[in-house]
Amino acid sequence: MKIAQELRAGSTIKIGNDPFVVLKAEYNKSGRNAAVVKFKMKNLISGNISDAVYKADDKMDDIKLDKVKAIYSYQNGDSYIFSNPETWEEIELKGEDLGDALNYLEEEMPLDVVYYESTAVAVELPTFVEREVTYTEPGLRGDTSGKVMKPARINTGFEVQVPLFVEQGEWIKIDTRTNEYVERVKK
């Protein structure tokens, strides 16, 4: 058991019979009222994202999820197939179970498959991935006041905001938790 104010992004809890992962936790204390914590959570069974508010001292059931190393193999319709590199067992997950992970999947990509009560419910990507910029508009010279960003499409088809100096064909590092550009990388 944990109290609500101890939970952070990435914590897993059980509400009713469903497991949830905390996407965002915001502590709020106003003058007269009791402290509260506002959560943005994802139901690991249904994939639904919901908002909830709890008193800071409410007790929550924290749960441990099992993780298994895997490699993304291929897509079959709406199913995505991963394989355990030790046993070569195939693990199948639906597209809606993968969420933002779909933006970064490439064949042979290592990741973790998350299990809840012996059922695969999600995947956990590496914190950072390196991807090639396949399309972006050229940056305009002189348009550099402040932190100016532009859209760039990476080799998986996902668009990410990058600084003006990033050009087509370059490789960039992206934070998979926030979907944000981190830096250019040499390949």
From Swiss-Prot:
Its main location: cytoplasm. InterPro entries: Elong-fact-P_C, NA-bd_OB-fold, Rib_uL2_dom2, Transl_elong_fac_P/YeiP, Transl_elong_KOW-like, Transl_elong_P/YeiP_cen, Transl_elong_P/YeiP_CS, Transl_elongation_fac_P. Pathway: Protein biosynthesis; polypeptide chain elongation. Keywords: Cytoplasm, Elongation factor, Protein biosynthesis. One of its GO terms (molecular function) is translation elongation factor activity. It is found in: Cytoplasm. GO terms for cellular component: cytoplasm. GO terms for biological process: peptide biosynthetic process. HAMAP family: EF_P. Involved in peptide bond synthesis. Stimulates efficient translation and peptide-bond synthesis on native or reconstituted 70S ribosomes in vitro. Probably functions indirectly by altering the affinity of the ribosome for aminoacyl-tRNA, thus increasing their reactivity as acceptors for peptidyl transferase. Belongs to the elongation factor P family. This is Elongation factor P. It comes from Fusobacterium nucleatum subsp. nucleatum (strain ATCC 25586 / DSM 15643 / BCRC 10681 / CIP 101130 / JCM 8532 / KCTC 2640 / LMG 13131 / VPI 4355). The gene is efp.
